[in-house]
Amino acid sequence: MSATPAIFWPHSEHWSVKIPLQTPHYRMPVMKDKGFVIMKTLDISNIPSSEWENLTYMDWKSGGDTNFAPLASCDGTIECKGFWENGKTDKDAKFTPNADLAPNLMKYIRSIPANFGRVRIIKLEPQTHDQAIRSVHRDDNNRLNPEDEGWVVRMWIELTDNPDSYMLLYDSDENNLPIKESEARVPMPKGAHFVVDSQRLWHVGVHNGNKPRYAVIISTESSPELNEWIIGKM
């Protein structure tokens, strides 16, 4: 009788472990407790699906079988690579041609009082918990970010209705490894709106569906103004 395969769990050699966590950057008090905040669900019923389905996507793998449509990038081109490859931190992004095809989405995104980095729409194919956990990771959001500036975090807006899917989150221990007991699950119905310190928290999307999940991911610089804006959205 064959043994049941062990479920994957990150170890000390995982690439995310080397990403720094303890730095002097400004961090928002609203994020301190759990490392994530769930905001009020957005009514996006007025936004047609063409604003995410008809964009130019890149075959870019991160957190599963994914494709990304950049709305803002380092230089305004349809590019997914890290800003540091151009010697920049993940801020001061320029909007891409895709942004012109998503006017309603962009109206809301531009209303967020923050310095933007990457803004992308993710297209994630279905994946179970056991499949997703193999892609759990932390983001290197703050590479080259000056230490006297704001810590870069990420914000999500769910575009498709996937109430049985969720963002799987784990806090980090003193060795930068995920703490199993800290597991949190953020549901992903249409309009779900949440912000994650994705350099602190290990994360991955579990998508229990039979169609792709679409969501906007927005890199933003932490600031007192953004902190108050998030509180107002809770």
Task: Report the location of each language-model feature.
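Histidine (H) residue identity feature
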Residues: H11-H14, H25, H129, H137, ...
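Intrinsic-disorder/low-complexity, polar/charged segments enriched in Ser/Thr/Lys/Arg/Asp/Glu/Gln
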Residues: G35-M39, V152-R154, A215
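Catalytic core of Fe(II)/2-oxoglutarate
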Residues: L168-M234
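Catalytic core of non-heme Fe(II) oxygenases with the double-stranded beta-helix
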Residues: P113-F194
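Structured loops at beta-to-helix junctions and adjacent beta-edge loops in soluble globular domains
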Residues: L71-C74, L124, T160, D197-Q199, ...
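Alpha-helical and His/Cys-centered functional microenvironments
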Residues: K18, N141, H207
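Non-heme Fe(II)/2-oxoglutarate
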Residues: P5-I121
